[in-house]
Amino acid sequence: MVREAWDRSRNLLTRIAEAVGADVPSELSLVSFGSLARMEFTSESDVDWCLLVDGRADANHREVQLRVQEALHGIAGTKDPNPAGAFGALVFSHEVIHCIGGAQDMNANLTRRMLLLIESVELNDPAIDRPRSRVLRGILQRYFEEEPRFPEKQFFPQ
């Protein structure tokens, strides 16, 4: 069962990269989360994904999102993410990195940030310094390097 899910995941990652990799410009990362990122994809799994933008917003990003969505529809064995959920969308790095806690940190943003950290995979060429790696560094910097600048704010409660 585990080996079957691993093989199914590896196969699907390859098919997605072949189907959409060339359509994703270098300022975007096509990122998958959940069972596909954990290499546990089954016939019941959906494909949770986002297009991660780190930089200037561009009207063309929406077109890329629609092409990715269409390409994923064409890959046998894939199900769309929950339409009311946090996936299948454009995600902007500024919100993920800087809206931590408080009223601006909505459930979808928190979900994306946590899953980026613990279970995400780049679906396009990871050799290029894509937004995913920069955003991961940015999140970790916010969590761990910002604290020394605020000595009254203790990282670990006493």
Give the predicted meaning of each segment.
Residues 1-26, 86-88:
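N-terminal regions immediately upstream of nucleotidyltransferase
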Residues 3-6, 58-62:
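Alpha-solenoid helical-repeat scaffolds
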Residues 14-60:
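Active-site nucleotide-donor binding segment shared across nucleotidyl transfer reactions
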Residues 17-23, 60-157:
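Conserved catalytic core of two-metal-ion nucleotidyltransferases
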